[in-house]
């Protein structure tokens, strides 16, 4: 029973960590993309 609870908690924790890392990754990627688009746009103007 205790092992099951521990497994469940660790799984939940891993899931939270994974989503958090994905969010940071996406934000960083979007930021880079946005910066690239902005510089290109400024260059065209």
UniProtKB/Swiss-Prot annotation:
- A biological process (GO) annotation for this entry? symbiont-mediated perturbation of host cell cycle G0/G1 transition checkpoint
Keywords for this protein = Eukaryotic host gene expression shutoff by virus, Eukaryotic host translation shutoff by virus, G0/G1 host cell cycle checkpoint dysregulation by virus, Host endoplasmic reticulum, Host gene expression shutoff by virus, Host-virus interaction, Modulation of host cell cycle by virus
Protein name (record)? Host translation inhibitor E66L
Report the principal subcellular site: host cell
Give the organism, scientific name: African swine fever virus (isolate Tick/South Africa/Pretoriuskop Pr4/1996)
Function, as annotated? Inhibits host protein translation, probably through the EIF2AK2/EIF2S1 signaling pathway. Promotes cell retention in the G0/G1 phase.
Q: Which GO terms describe its cellular component?
A: host cell endoplasmic reticulum
Subcellular location per the Swiss-Prot or TrEMBL entry: Host endoplasmic reticulum
Q: Tell me its family.
A: Belongs to the asfivirus E66L family.
